[in-house]
Amino acid sequence: MSVDRIDQVIPTLASRDAIGGHTVQLRDLLRAQGYQSDIYYGNASPDRLEFGYPVSRLGEHPASGRVLLYQLSIGSGVADIVRERGERKFVNYHNITPADLVEAWMPEVGEEVRWGRAQLRDLAPVTEFAIADSGFNERELRSAGYRSTVTLPLLIDLDSFSGAPDPVVASRLAEAKAQGGTDLLFVGKVSPHKGQDDLIKALATYRQLYDPQARLHIVGGSISEEYSVALERFVEELELTAAVEFAGVVNHEELIAYYAAADVFCCLSNHEGFCVPLLESMVHRLPIVAYTNTAVPETVQGAGLVLPDKEPARVAAAIDRVVGDDRLRKVLAAASAERLETFALPRVREGFAAALDAACAV
């Protein structure tokens, strides 16, 4: 039976969220391909309500000729609703953080991700086709029992990572830099699995061995008050209070200012299904030093230095290398430009269009 409608279902349609933005981009692509397409969400940010409909309205269209494409990244009752419905089903998998990386600090989040991984397995028998945004994620799909899979990166407008920096933040960062010192940057949620404690250890070692004026800027909101407090105490114990900034949630212009002022992007995360800030760093031609774990080496490839472990002295040496070697910085900048071609929106749109048309035709 031919498919004339592909509707996406997502647990939460959030603003300034890579998966939420991808979902809207995919809806627009599906409509351009001639499919009827809407988004149904369990929850939505106030400024995203108009982009879709509550999942309670999912039954307003007939199942015949319709595909439900579920955006899977967390445990949610929405997944159970999709699984029980009679439409053909596709899944777009963005990975789910293993519970053992978060549950000691956030038991409730540990329960959510365990639920999500159980749903990943439960959806496999009823899913015809699954898309992963990295090869790492596709291997997890295969292990969970999905038979027909493909790797396609997130639909992202790379131009959206550019723009004018916030003048207030830019001025503050420039004043600090005028006093000397390297600026290290990490962008991402403050969460145990993101490895901010390892970043702080690396900064301490880098200051001791190479640059006593170096600073670390951690940009992103916290999802664990307990972990955030522990990090702040750790910073105090190491006497780094003046050298570590927890910037919290920032707007787009403020984020641009942090990227523009940074000398190195450092990622020591314990788990990443893709890691969009790596692409942001490439757009800004910011050298990357990263722990080679999960999807990180696949996303970075030759556009950064990837390390086999997070031993502070090794990380510090890598940072010193990219800061002090102009030729290496130019090589990495050129590699970033080349790597970004893989993620160019027109190219990824073509991949999604071809893959979904083929899956619907089966």
Predicted segments, located by residue:
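Aromatic "clamp/platform" in nucleotide-sugar-dependent glycosyltransferases that forms part
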Residues: 270
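A conserved mid-protein helix/loop that constitutes part of the nucleotide-sugar donor-binding site
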Residues: 21, 182, 191-205, 226-229, ...
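Donor nucleotide-sugar binding/catalytic pocket of nucleotide-sugar-dependent glycosyltransferases
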Residues: 124-174
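Conserved acidic donor-binding segment of nucleotide-sugar-dependent glycosyltransferases
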Residues: 292, 305-313, 321-326
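Short hydrophobic beta-strand element within catalytic cores of glycosyltransferases
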Residues: 278, 287-290
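Glycosyltransferase donor-sugar binding loop
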Residues: 41-45, 215-232
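Short alpha-helical donor nucleotide-sugar binding micro-motif in glycosyltransferases
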Residues: 250, 257-262
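Nucleotide-activated donor-binding/catalytic signature segment of Leloir-type glycosyltransferases, i.e.
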Residues: 220, 228-250
